[in-house]
From Swiss-Prot:
Residues 1-17 form the signal peptide. Keywords: Allergen, Glycoprotein, Secreted, Signal. This is Mite allergen Der p 7. GO terms for cellular component: extracellular region. Glycans are attached at residue 151. It comes from the Eukaryota. Its main location: secreted. The lineage of its organism: Eukaryota, Metazoa, Ecdysozoa, Arthropoda, Chelicerata. It is found in: Secreted. Belongs to the mite group 7 allergen family.
Length: 215
């Protein structure tokens, strides 16, 4: 039934600005995305999500002091992805006869947390500790197209830049200058390596579920 509704609505939207048909196809796209998210959440592969170990070198400045160090992140697990939900309605438009939609999926009533073991070298310090990093604004941005046959195709999928990351580093107070250095380095790694890994794992899974139910 969804497929038939998509075919009819897509045909009208592609040639008409009738809000009734935009509302209908928006409703069907919302439903399809919700079903894809629900299917992903049922998989034990994604929560917790395992992220490859990561090693890095860093350099930071505190006043006139130049700090150089190394760190190793091990046993990285991401928890909380089962809380993902669609954020608002699909933004639907027609371009050259092709129906396109843009949506956001995110975790807003809870946090996505990364838990891992951290070993770092900073001057004479060579400790091993445990870290929990909370992402308080986890958002995925995605786009899709609906063909005249009612088939949905995922055209883009990306985990957005994290705007708010709170790090809890074992053995360090938030007032400790070393905490500030490590927190800055870790957050930069999340924005690059970890965010890319999340996109790499989630995108094909979402594409598979969305297109399997709407082909």
């Amino acid at each position: 039934m969804m497929k038939l509704l998509l075919i009819a609505a897509a045909a009208f939207v592609a040639v008409s600005a009738d809000p009734i048909h935009y509302d209908k196809i928006t409703e069907e796209i919302n439903k399809a995305v919700d079903e894809a998210v629900a299917a992903i959440e049922k998989s034990e592969t994604f929560d917790p999500m395992k992220v490859p170990d990561h090693s890095d070198k860093f350099e930071r400045h505190i006043g006139i002091i130049d700090l150089k160090g190394e760190l190793d992140m091990r046993n990285i697990q991401v928890r909380g992805l089962k809380q993902m939900k669609r954020v608002g309605d699909a933004n639907v438009k027609s371009e050259d006869g092709v129906v396109k939609a843009h949506l956001l999926v995110g975790v807003h009533d809870d946090v996505v947390s990364m838990e891992y073991d951290l070993a770092y070298k900073l001057g004479d310090l060579h400790p091993n500790t445990h870290v929990i990093s909370d992402i308080q604004d986890f958002v995925v941005e995605l786009s899709l197209e609906v063909s005249e046959e009612g088939n949905m195709t995922l055209t883009s999928f990306e985990v957005r830049q994290f705007a708010n990351v709170v790090n809890h580093i074992g053995g360090l107070s938030i007032l400790d200058p070393i905490f500030a250095v490590l927190s800055d380095v870790l957050t930069a790694i999340f924005q690059d390596t970890v965010r890319a890994e999340m996109t790499k794992v989630l995108a094909p899974a979402f594409k598979k579920e969305l297109e399997r139910n709407n082909q």
